[in-house]
């Protein structure tokens, strides 16, 4: 039986720095990238493009199973490509976000997307960014990281990010939203946000991104070496 491509899962709460870390890892290692958080938005956009009814689970399942999506890494950003078109900005619209929330409620759609996500596991390897990558999607991943940071630090990062883009934002409101989202994510019935038992927990609160990257790469080298030796 041929050996499967290695997977590194990066899970954690919103604002912990997963996206930046995954982009750097994919660039450094030359591995494929899966942004699971974008998958439902991409499916929603595909449904809108193809006039598929958002309340028809039966119509959405085959669309999910055959979703033509790629995540392309370059030095500036991760491009989300649907059917050959860069949709990185389009999937962030409110219309697509609302549609994504609606279709995510269908169990058979979730199951189809689970299989689609697992199909990203190709040589030379996969960096999987999400919230349940190491616990649900790739429980057999060779390297599992849970990237965390205090709610205050994550709110501060988001505050600076939005300010730099010219938005007028309230820090206390951001902090409240992050705490509420954490509570929802950690206590939901299906795939709650939690570190896999065999994950390395990295608290990035007082670390630079370079320090986080170095820590993860050193751990990955150790784990992948152990996996190839066993």
UniProtKB/Swiss-Prot annotation:
EC numbers for this chain: 2.7.4.25
GO biological process: nucleobase-containing small molecule interconversion; pyrimidine nucleotide metabolic process
GO cellular component: cytosol
Pfam families membership: Cytidylate_kin (PF02224)
Keyword Cytoplasm found: yes
Residues binding ATP, per UniProt: 12-20
Catalysed transformations (reactions): CMP + ATP = CDP + ADP; dCMP + ATP = dCDP + ADP
HAMAP family to which the protein is assigned, alphabetical: Cytidyl_kinase_type1
Protein family according to the UniProt entry: Belongs to the cytidylate kinase family. Type 1 subfamily.
PANTHER family: CYTIDYLATE KINASE (PTHR21299:SF2), CYTIDYLATE KINASE/PANTOATE-BETA-ALANINE LIGASE (PTHR21299)
Name this protein carries in UniProt: Cytidylate kinase
Species annotation: Aeromonas salmonicida (strain A449)
Lineage: Bacteria, Pseudomonadati, Pseudomonadota, Gammaproteobacteria, Aeromonadales
């Amino acid at each position: 039986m041929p050996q499967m491509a290695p997977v590194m899962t990066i899970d954690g709460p919103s604002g912990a720095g997963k996206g930046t870390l995954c982009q750097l890892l994919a660039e450094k290692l030359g591995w494929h990238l899966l942004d699971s958080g974008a998958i439902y938005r991409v499916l929603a956009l595909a449904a809108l493009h193809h006039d598929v009814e958002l309340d028809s689970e039966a119509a959405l399942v085959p669309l999910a199973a055959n979703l033509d999506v790629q995540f392309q890494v370059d030095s500036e950003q991760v491009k989300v490509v649907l059917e050959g078109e860069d949709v990185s900005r389009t999937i962030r619209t409110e219309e697509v976000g609302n549609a994504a929330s609606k279709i995510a409620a269908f169990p058979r759609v979730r199951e189809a997307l689970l299989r689609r996500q697992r199909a990203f596991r190709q040589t030379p390897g996969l960096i999987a960014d999400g919230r349940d990558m190491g616990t649900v999607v790739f429980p057999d991943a060779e390297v599992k990281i849970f990237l965390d940071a205090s709610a205050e630090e994550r709110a501060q990062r988001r505050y600076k990010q939005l300010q730099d883009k010219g938005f007028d934002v309230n820090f206390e409101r951001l902090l409240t939203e992050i705490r509420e989202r954490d509570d929802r994510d950690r206590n939901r019935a299906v795939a709650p946000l939690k570190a896999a038992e065999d994950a390395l927990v990295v608290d990035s609160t007082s670390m630079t991104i370079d320090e986080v990257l170095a820590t993860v790469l050193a751990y990955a080298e150790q784990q992948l070496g152990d996996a190839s030796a066993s």
